[in-house]
Swiss-Prot record:
Protein name: Phosphatidylinositol 4-kinase gamma 4
Entry comment describing in which tissues the protein is expressed: Specifically expressed in the phloem including companion cells.
EC nos: 2.7.1.67
PANTHER family linked to this entry: PHOSPHATIDYLINOSITOL 4-KINASE GAMMA, PHOSPHATIDYLINOSITOL 4-KINASE GAMMA 4
Segments for region (Activation loop): 425-451
Record's subunit section: Interacts with FTIP1 and RPN10.
Region (Catalytic loop) location: 402-410
Domain PI3K/PI4K catalytic, first and last residues per copy: 257-542
Location of region: G-loop: 263-269
The organism's taxonomic lineage, starting at the top: Eukaryota, Viridiplantae, Streptophyta, Embryophyta, Tracheophyta
One GO term (biological process): negative regulation of long-day photoperiodism, flowering
PROSITE patterns: PI3_4_KINASE_3 (PS50290), UBIQUITIN_2 (PS50053)
Residues the record lists as binding ATP: T264, E265, G266, S267, G268, G269, V270, K286, Q369, L370, F371, V372, D427
Length: 565
């Protein structure tokens, strides 16, 4: 399974290597100089053309720095450059602008070092680095606090590690505990997880009290609140057995001393929660104050200036609510969620929880989602092997919720039996937006999306009811804004009407997604046409009836066109 993180580029030695198409051409009228910004690195100049596509910019970053295009996320003015075929000018990039670059790398190891007195050291070290490099980083960061290199001795599994040993060689041995002995004396204990290394510096006198990690979570004293507890706005809400079991397992892990481990994946704070044995991940916690562009975001993204999230139509701090909403609205074909029946699209059990900072007396609120063992993501393999029904179940969810961030990296691939592959959708913090502007579905270009819905799938679509969904979310404590409610009603309407006419997920999804940043999607055109057709003060019900009539006209026209081919 691949891991991810914020990569670090060294400053450019020669800005000519980033000239458009590998040529100097420094004085072209169409060219501008932008700066790539990453945490801990000075902004790096890069010359591009106004007519360059986002894909070509990513390709040049790959060509000169080796970062594969599919691993790159470019952010400008608080929004992601998500449409690869759009020009940089479409996003408003001008001379001197700063472009934030997030890169996911398979061999990047995040290392956190924390002393008993609260002093923290954080590093990002590639697997190809050796133990000596880690010592250098630690000494440079700590100064005289941890002594010189000659005072440090790393011991793993009873044997001293040599300075020339690679981090990758140690990682191959699985979960590892490394001890760093210092003359004073002190030691550093390092726990190696799937994607994260957590190092704790312990002095003898403070050893019994050290119970903190990146989240500052600690084992609670008697009489104190549980380290994790669900947030239930309505006392009538009954959490599913799967959600309760996930919460209990998370609490057991923390109480046994296995603290959350920060993942290097994603553009926000993501933490793996361990089970009671500490050997397996049981859940994934995403604090709202560490979301992209939130005040405590650990990835170096700028703070939102207007409250809007990374995707247009979303708000910073609402990602956890959207994660939970996706689970609530993923209805089973039969039965109900409270009976522990899985949803049609397979969204893992998710709940809004409060994680306590026992040391600080405060807490973090966020989404807690069941960790799903997997064989990687759809990003790691070609889509042709995926069953049609598995792809289409995710397409239905994304169309309904107008997902603004569906890519291959947030669809997990699991083995269901010997030959059958099962897809699990995750990361729904950008669903249910207030507008359709940023809807993106990577499955749109997979062959399964061009297959018609089967009878069972079509029947499920026919049973969907947006008004009931809105009422259900309100019952659980989230009253959708009028804009979000309108988007949900329109997207559900489109899905149902499209399926009735025999349209494929590709046909329907294409109506929701823009082809370029500047060119509005067909659904946006339908909404504008409806707005022009009604009088000021018209009720929402009348407006939706107008949308329905215009949508019928467009879909009938499309259905006739498709029958000719």
């Amino acid at each position: 399974m691949s891991s991810a993180g914020i990569a670090t580029l060294s400053p450019l030695l020669d800005q000519f290597c980033f000239a458009p198409h590998g040529e100097p051409r420094l004085q072209q009228l169409d060219s501008i100089v932008i700066f790539l910004a990453m945490p801990g690195v000075a902004p790096m100049p890069m010359r591009v053309l106004h007519s360059d596509s986002v894909a070509s910019v990513k390709l040049r970053i790959q060509q000169f720095k080796g970062f594969v295009t599919t691993k790159q996320r470019l952010v400008f003015s608080g929004h992601e450059l998500s449409l690869n075929n759009s020009h940089v000018r479409d996003y408003g990039l001008t001379d001197g602008n700063v472009l934030h670059l997030v890169v996911r790398l398979a061999d990047l190891r995040a290392i956190s070092i924390e002393t008993a007195n609260g002093k923290k050291f954080q590093f990002q070290v590639e697997s190809c680095c050796n133990v000596g490099y880690l010592k250098d980083k630690l000494s440079a960061e700590s100064g005289q606090q941890l002594g010189s290199l000659k005072d440090q001795r790393l011991v793993f599994d009873g044997e001293e590690l040599e300075d020339n040993q690679l981090i990758a060689d140690i990682s191959k041995k699985g979960a590892a505990v490394i001890h760093l002995f210092i003359r004073r004396p002190a030691k550093v204990q390092t726990q190696q997880g799937d994607k994260e290394t957590v190092v704790t510096v312990v002095t003898p006198k403070d050893n019994d009290n050290l119970q903190t990690d990146a989240l500052n979570l600690a084992k609670p004293a008697k009489g104190k609140p549980a380290p994790v507890e669900p947030i239930i706005a309505n006392g009538k809400v009954k959490l599913s057995p799967a959600v309760m079991e996930m919460i209990y397992s998370t609490i057991s892990g923390i109480e046994n001393g296995y603290l959350p481990v920060m993942s290097t994946e994603g553009s926000g704070g993501v933490y793996f929660m361990k089970d009671s044995s500490g050997e397996s991940n049981v859940a994934v916690f995403k604090p709202i104050d560490e979301e992209p562009m939130a005040k405590n975001n650990p990835r170096g993204l700028p703070l939102s200036t207007d409250g809007e999230g990374l995707k247009r139509g979303t708000r910073v701090g609402e990602g956890a609510l959207r994660e939970v909403a996706a689970y609530i609205l993923d209805h089973p074909v039969y039965g109900c969620k409270s009976c522990d029946v899985p949803g049609f699209s397979g969204v893992p059990p998710t709940a809004l929880v409060r994680c306590f900072h026992m040391g600080k007396g405060s807490n973090k609120v966020g989404s807690l989602q069941l960790f799903v063992d997997n064989n990687g993501s759809c990003e790691d393999m070609g889509p042709r092997a995926f069953p049609v029904k598995e792809v289409q179940k995710i397409a239905i969810l994304d169309i309904r919720l107008a997902n603004a961030d569906r890519h291959a990296g947030n669809i997990l691939v699991c083995q269901d039996g010997e030959d059958h592959l099962k897809l699990i959708p995750i990361d729904h913090g950008y669903c249910l937006p207030e507008k359709f502007e940023d809807c993106t579905f990577e499955w749109l270009y997979w062959p399964q999306a061009r297959e018609p819905f089967g009878p069972e799938t079509a029947a499920y679509i026919g049973s969907l009811d947006a008004d009931k969904d809105i009422a259900l979310l309100k019952f659980h404590g989230w009253a959708l804004s009028p804009q979000c409610a309108r988007v949900l009603r329109i997207s559900t309407m489109l899905l149902k009407k499209g399926a009735e006419r025999g349209l494929t997920p590709y046909d329907i999804g294409s109506i929701l997604c823009r082809q370029t940043v500047k060119k509005e999607s067909e659904i946006e055109a339908i909404i504008e046409e409806a707005e022009d057709a009604i009088l000021p003060g018209t009720s929402e019900e009348t407006f939706l009836e107008t949308i329905s009539e215009i949508m019928d006209f467009h879909l009938d026209k499309l259905a006739v066109k498709l029958k000719k081919f």
